[in-house]
Amino acid sequence: MDWIKETFGTHKPIIAMCHVRALPGDPYFDADGGMEKVVDMARQEFLALQEGGVDAVMFSNEFSLPYLTKVEPVTTACMARVVGELKSEIKIPFGVNMLWDPYASLDLAAATGAKFIREIMSGVYASDYGLWDTDPGAIVRHQMRLGLKNVKLLWNIVPEAAKYLADRPIEQIAKTTVFNNKPDVICVSGITAGAATDTDVLARVKNAIPTTAVFANTGCKLETIEKILGIADGAVVGTTFKKDGLFDNHVELDRVKAFMDKVHSIR
């Protein structure tokens, strides 16, 4: 897992989420504020994350609710504009995530130069979005066709708002996912953004695949990050950086700094 330190400059990295507000075509897009407001808000939140000392950032269309499993082209185009307008200000490694579409995530990575993506790329799930099917072979072939062999894949095997259809132990899912798909990172999530990752499940996954990186994907807090990083190889963190730790609120610099001070004290 030497690539983790090479990519993020540290072991056990904290990847901060920059949750982009609703975009054109999304039901809750602010048409009065327009894309200019979306970009301005993304810039404010990104700069707070970067100044707060996070190791990397991941831009996602987090407010494109309700989510699609096949993202519309306008959404990817608007996300490319957001990242493109911020690109000159980005001084840390960054990734992208188009919820919930790995193909669109790869397309956005190709457009922006992102170093990693995160998505659901294997398994079949009963979810809030309907029956959720995947095709990892086609996804990885799309990655290679786009010339993105160096883009790291953060592979979520416990997706939010969904349950694996087959009655298989999580250890078995982790092992076969690694064997069949060679993911760079396995992500373990809670039930929604901001919901705690079950540390027992996290430990079971890590014990099952000790030579593969495992990241906690949701719900990391100042009070829990020490325990989480005692198990995981890194964490994706978003909601806890926001005012009062609430999903709908905006990132606060002081919360980011306090969290990262804690991380620096334990790693």
Predicted region positions:
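Conserved, mostly hydrophobic/aromatic
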Residues: 16, 49, 57, 117, ...
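Catalytic cores of alpha/beta
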Residues: 96, 101-114, 172-173, 205-237
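Active-site mouth loops of central-metabolism enzymes
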Residues: 19-44, 94-101, 155-171, 216-221
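Short beta-strand segments at enzyme active-site cores
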Residues: 14-17, 53-66, 94-98, 119, ...
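Alpha/beta catalytic cores of nucleotide-metabolism and tRNA/nucleoside-modifying enzymes
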Residues: 141-142, 161, 221-226, 232-267
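Conserved anion-binding
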Residues: 20-23, 104, 108-184
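Glycine-rich, proline-tolerant flexible connector loops at the mouths of alpha/beta enzymes
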Residues: 53-78, 124-129, 183-196, 243-246
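Alpha-helix-loop-beta-strand connector modules within alpha/beta enzyme cores
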Residues: 10-11, 16-17, 68-96, 134-154, ...
